[in-house]
Design a protein with these regions (language model features):
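ADP-ribose/adenylate-binding Rossmann-like module
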Residues: 88-94, 99-125
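Glycine-rich, highly charged phosphate/nucleotide-binding loops
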Residues: 56-58, 62-83
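Hydrophobic, well-ordered beta-alpha structural blocks that scaffold small-molecule cofactor pockets
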Residues: 1-44, 49-52
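An accessory alpha-helical subdomain
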Residues: 143-150
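Short glycine-/small-residue-rich Rossmann-like dinucleotide-binding loops
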Residues: 77, 93-94, 141
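Residue-level detector of alpha-helix initiation sites
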Residues: 22-23, 96-97, 143
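Hydrophobic beta-strand scaffold residues
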Residues: 38, 73, 110-113
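Structural motif
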Residues: 14, 87-88
Length: 150
């Protein structure tokens, strides 16, 4: 797969994260650092995610149910929760079935998706980032060996 390296403006953009564990926490921290509005949808949440909640910045939404629970919740509640015009979806669960279903949901809704369990399903990757003042460098292995890019 050929990927194009690019930087996008995320200030005040809505980003969804499915899953509330350590991977979700790391992704949320990166997105919040870029000024995004982050909504985390999960059955359970790392305590740090819940403690950092702030309306319009980081919001955690609890769901119950099987692999389609997050997609069903989004279909039923997105508008009333103020979640529209989603910039990206990050599937950060450790359940490949849930991540696969959410990638399908994202594609149906024309939302770029990233999957923690299947790099081949990713529309984009999170690079390792080095910042020095106004200089920002992103290094990626295209999801192949993320530890190598650190």
């Amino acid at each position: 797969m050929a990927v194009f390296p690019m930087f996008i403006e995320l200030e005040n953009e809505i980003c969804l994260i499915i899953g509330g564990g350590k991977v979700a926490l790391r992704k949320a921290e990166v997105l919040l650092d870029m000024g995004a509005e982050v909504h985390v949808i999960s059955r359970e949440f790392e305590s740090e995610l819940e403690q950092c909640q702030s309306p319009g910045r980081l919001e955690c939404h609890a769901v119950d149910g099987g692999p389609l629970a997050a997609a069903v919740w989004l279909e039923q509640n997105a508008r009333k929760e103020g979640i529209g015009n989603v910039a990206m979806l990050i599937c950060a669960t450790d359940d490949e079935r849930i991540n696969d279903q959410m990638v399908l949901w994202a594609r149906k809704n024309r939302i770029p998706a990233n999957s923690a369990t299947n790099p081949a399903d990713c529309d984009f990757y999170f690079p390792s980032v080095v910042r020095r003042g106004n200089l920002m460098v992103g290094v990626s292995t295209g999801g192949g060996t993320p530890a190598l890019s650190r």
